[in-house]
Regions:
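Short amphipathic alpha-helical recognition elements used for nucleic-acid or partner binding
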Residues: 21-52, 72
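Short boundary/linker motifs that mark transitions into or out of structured domains
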Residues: 1-30, 82-88, 117
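Ca2+-coordinating acidic residues in Ca2+-binding motifs
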Residues: 47, 64, 103
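Short hydrophobic/aromatic patches on the structural cores and recognition surfaces of FHA
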Residues: 16, 48, 72, 88-89, ...
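Conserved catalytic core of Hanks-type protein kinase domains
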Residues: 36-37, 75, 114, 176
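Short beta-strand(s) of the beta-wing in winged-helix/HTH DNA-binding folds
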Residues: 44, 79-83, 121
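Intrinsically disordered, charged and Pro/Gly-enriched terminal/linker segments
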Residues: 24-25, 29-31, 57-60, 86-176
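C-terminal flanking helix
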Residues: 66-69, 73-80
Length: 176
């Protein structure tokens, strides 16, 4: 049996695909948890519970987190979110997960076309300033990486007299 593939599109309007089929979750906190774990790797349970449910008491936040993990794994049909120990959460390293952010950050100049807008563009979590702040930081980070890569490509294209590509990258920069 082929291994399931979870693909996250995070640059521009975000979406989640399981084996080429888009997955829609019943509440945004599931998406937020997946996005946060994918970008940050292993995180402390209390940290993520506090970020996603900052207006709730600790016990309620932890209960909500457990339910969110259960719902995510149930809807995705497997153990995608795991707890290597009682205090840490991560995406399962044995599962196949890929994203546009990974490809883009590994080789930005080669993957400029993946930058289709701000990180998690249009994604909003009600009552979660900490999550919104994190998203803002990530947006700045990826936008700066994009701008740097565009300038690098412009230099390369200028040196090779590839005016068509240079014009395309200038248009990318102007669109920001």
């Amino acid at each position: 049996m082929a291994k399931n593939l979870l693909r996250l599109k995070l640059l521009g309007s975000p979406s989640v695909f399981l084996n080429q089929e888009e997955v829609f979750f019943p509440f945004a906190k599931i998406n937020a948890l997946l996005y946060y774990l994918h970008i940050n790797g292993a995180v402390n349970r209390e940290e993520i519970a506090g970020i996603l449910w900052e207006n709730k008491d600790n016990q309620t936040a932890k209960k909500n987190l457990r339910n969110t993990i259960y719902q995510a794994n149930k809807l995705l049909g497997g153990e995608w979110i795991v707890a290597p120990n009682r205090t840490v959460l991560s995406l399962n390293p044995e599962c196949a997960i890929e994203s546009d952010v990974e490809l883009f950050t590994d080789h930005p100049a080669e993957h400029l076309s993946l930058y289709q807008g701000d990180f998690l563009q249009g994604f909003y979590l009600k009552d979660s300033e900490a999550f919104d702040y994190w998203v803002s930081k990530m947006r700045i980070r990826y936008e700066q990486l994009y701008i740097q890569a565009c300038y690098q490509q412009l230099e390369t294209e200028k040196d090779h007299l590839d005016l068509e590509e240079a014009e395309r990258n200038l248009r990318r920069l102007i669109s920001i």
